[in-house]
């Protein structure tokens, strides 16, 4: 297998459909056109032609599109054959194409990888293709499209350019120490550095919003048996996702629902009631419940309001609170307000949000929805936003750390060499986002998660 091979893959989903598309990219795409079509179509024009087998018989008839490189998606010669979407027809056509020497099936994401390697798009834009396909909401799709069009990359490139200018200024101060003007102490470098840090903080904030849109928030409903956890899952999901009975311990395994609140994706997880297990099946369910709790972004601590008047989680169940991860946010949900007569709504107790509601009737559930949205700091009115991945957030965080360390060197010791090194490392972190400095292993992992024909 060579990167110089001409590759072919189906660009439409598998199965039956009105249209099926095969995409070919590489040096032999021209030969494929002349062999299968009998001619080379006019560049960037739709040509309705028969697709022929080796013996000259017609396999299908459809539209052929020819994009000579470098003016194509991949930067190479690209041929698209758009025929009927029957799997048998597409398979016959694919087999015919693969009889031509030098052609092979594309790896997942290889078309996008070649576009990246040929400078047709940067790494953040390439990732946006997969994010656009996988978008689970309208807002996520719009943000992915913004990233594909270069919104995220433009912000990162602006930071890289600012760091380049700053590094030139610092290097000049180091190389010409005998000049009358002390560049390091006259305040200009500090002012420029503060501007870059402020711009980076703004990009980090937008990237966190983009990560929320892409990754979603994992919320685990936990508590004792029969507290109403499954009823709350159903209320949030808007359907009967979980079985609800008066029998304690009805939920034995983890139940997952994916919902959206004003465009924000939420992964709601209902868990088995936490208690001393009565059998092996329940023990496994409780063990899985704790695994989910430890990986959660937030826990909804479900309390049966008819069993206690306490509102402080440490008073309600100290052993449960003691076992939770130290920094895990908790929302106390006092359920069955329709029975206890408690006033619906949200308050605060010991630094934790407290919400009184009735999962059975749905009263107060909207308060919980708004609380979940606000707790993540999600801005539903965000215009021109972009999607971001965890690796993007990590790169931005590392760049911010290097800039802060560089500032400390500047203010503490006027150490120009150390400041220059921190600026270089910050610039390298930012360049990893767009792929200017990225390891081959990381590129392989990123593109292998794509669809075959992308």
UniProtKB/Swiss-Prot annotation:
Cofactor: K(+)
Entry's family note: Belongs to the TRAFAC class TrmE-Era-EngA-EngB-Septin-like GTPase superfamily. TrmE GTPase family.
GO MF assignments: GTP binding; GTPase activity; metal ion binding
GO cellular component, one term: cytosol
Cofactor binding summary note: Binds 1 potassium ion per subunit.
Keyword Transmembrane helix (UniProt): no
Cellular location(s): Cytoplasm
Binding site for Mg(2+): 230, 251
Domain TrmE-type G as annotated: residue spans: 216-377
Enzyme Commission number: 3.6.-.-
PANTHER family: TRNA MODIFICATION GTPASE GTPBP3, TRNA MODIFICATION GTPASE GTPBP3, MITOCHONDRIAL
SUPFAM superfamilies with a match to the protein in the record: P-loop containing nucleoside triphosphate hydrolases (SSF52540), TrmE connector domain (SSF116878)
Record: residues binding K(+): 226, 245, 247, 250
GO biological process, one term: tRNA methylation
Subunit record text: Homodimer. Heterotetramer of two MnmE and two MnmG subunits.
Amino-acid positions noted as binding (6S)-5-formyl-5,6,7,8-tetrahydrofolate in the UniProt annotation, renumbered to this chain: 23, 80, 120, 454
Listed Pfam families: MMR_HSR1, MnmE_helical, TrmE_N
Sorted UniProt keywords: Cytoplasm, GTP-binding, Hydrolase, Magnesium, Metal-binding, Nucleotide-binding, Potassium, tRNA processing
Transmembrane portions of the chain: none
The protein's role, per its UniProt record: Exhibits a very high intrinsic GTPase hydrolysis rate. Involved in the addition of a carboxymethylaminomethyl (cmnm) group at the wobble position (U34) of certain tRNAs, forming tRNA-cmnm(5)s(2)U34.
Keyword match Magnesium: yes
Native species: Escherichia coli (strain SMS-3-5 / SECEC)
Name of this chain's protein: tRNA modification GTPase MnmE
């Amino acid at each position: 297998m060579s990167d110089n091979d001409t590759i072919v893959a189906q660009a439409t989903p598998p199965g039956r459909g009105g249209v099926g598309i095969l995409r070919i990219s590489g040096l032999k795409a021209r030969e494929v056109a002349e062999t299968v079509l009998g001619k080379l179509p006019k560049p960037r024009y739709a040509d309705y032609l028969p697709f022929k087998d080796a013996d000259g018989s017609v396999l299908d008839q459809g539209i052929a599109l020819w994009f000579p490189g470098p003016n194509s998606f991949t930067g190479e010669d690209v041929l698209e054959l758009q025929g009927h979407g029957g799997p048998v027809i597409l398979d016959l056509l694919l087999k015919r194409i693969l009889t031509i020497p030098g052609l092979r099936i594309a790896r997942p994401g290889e078309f996008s990888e070649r576009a990246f390697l040929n400078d047709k798009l940067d790494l953040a834009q390439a990732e946006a293709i997969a994010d656009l396909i996988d978008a689970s909401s309208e807002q996520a799709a719009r943000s992915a499209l913004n990233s594909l069009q270069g919104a995220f990359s433009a912000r990162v490139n602006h930071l890289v350019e600012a760091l380049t200018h700053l590094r030139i200024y610092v290097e000049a101060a180091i190389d010409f120490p005998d000049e009358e003007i002390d560049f390091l102490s006259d305040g200009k470098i500090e002012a420029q550095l503060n501007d870059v840090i402020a711009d980076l903080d703004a990009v980090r904030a937008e990237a966190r919003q983009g990560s929320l849109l892409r990754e979603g928030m994992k919320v685990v409903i936990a508590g004792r048996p029969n507290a109403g956890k499954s009823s709350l899952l159903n209320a949030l999901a808007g359907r009967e996702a979980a079985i609800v009975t008066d029998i304690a311990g009805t939920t034995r395994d983890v139940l997952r629902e994916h919902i959206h609140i004003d465009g924000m994706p939420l992964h709601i997880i209902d868990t088995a009631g936490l208690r001393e297990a009565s059998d092996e099946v329940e023990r496994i369910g409780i063990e899985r419940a704790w695994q989910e709790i430890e990986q959660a972004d937030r826990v909804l601590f479900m309390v049966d309001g008819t069993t206690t008047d306490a509102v402080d989680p440490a008073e309600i169940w100290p052993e449960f609170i003691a076992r939770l991860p130290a920094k895990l946010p908790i929302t106390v949900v006092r359920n069955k307000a329709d029975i206890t007569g408690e006033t619906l709504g949200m308050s605060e107790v010991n630094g934790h949000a407290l919400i009184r509601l009735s999962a059975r009737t749905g009263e107060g559930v909207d308060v919980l929805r708004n609380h979940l949205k606000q707790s993540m700091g999600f801005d539903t009115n965000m215009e021109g936003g972009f999607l971001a991945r965890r690796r993007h957030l990590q790169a931005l965080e590392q760049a911010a750390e290097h800039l802060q360390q560089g500032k400390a060197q500047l203010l503490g010791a006027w150490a120009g060499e150390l400041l220059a090194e921190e600026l270089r490392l910050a610039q390298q972190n930012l360049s990893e986002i767009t792929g200017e400095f990225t390891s081959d292993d990381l590129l392989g992992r990123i593109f292998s998660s794509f669809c075959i024909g992308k």
